[in-house]
């Protein structure tokens, strides 16, 4: 399972998405609030969303419309891009790119969205089962729809374990992000 919290329905609280081994994404809408969550399973928005085996979701507004879209990593090392489409009082996700960024990171892509360099812009970090981590940052030469360019300075010196699943948090409260990597064997680095 690959859980991620994000405000998908725009109501100001975090909903829960879980990618799974079969390739689907499960959605639990938070019917509570930001202080007391009440997660209710809601499959409607994700009918037809197939991220590929071992789906790992990441959420971000990719097309500049103010609504969160969806990236999914999968077993074969690719990313799929789904855009959010409004329909009546609800929404659904439509596949826009099967091989987003023409990327093949190797077995098991794990996308994460974070701001690595404190520039108030989202960076895309992708881990893989092979232990590789690559990163992309927004391309300032292409305003409007979010476009990425490789960011080569990060992670090139790291020798990571098989099944590298990166997570970023300020563990030591010094104002910058620290990297934690989960491995296939269950160890944290």
Question: Where are the model-predicted features located?
Answer:
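Beta-propeller blade termini
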Residues: 1-8, 54-62, 109-116, 164-171
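Hydrophobic beta-strand segments that make up the repeating blades of beta-propeller
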Residues: 16-20, 70-74, 124-128, 179-183
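Calcium-coordinating acidic loop motifs
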Residues: 7-13, 31, 61-67, 115-117, ...
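Blade-edge motifs of beta-propeller repeat domains
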Residues: 29-52, 83-106, 137-162
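Short, intrinsically disordered, charge-balanced linker/junction segments flanking boundaries
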Residues: 174-177, 182, 186-189
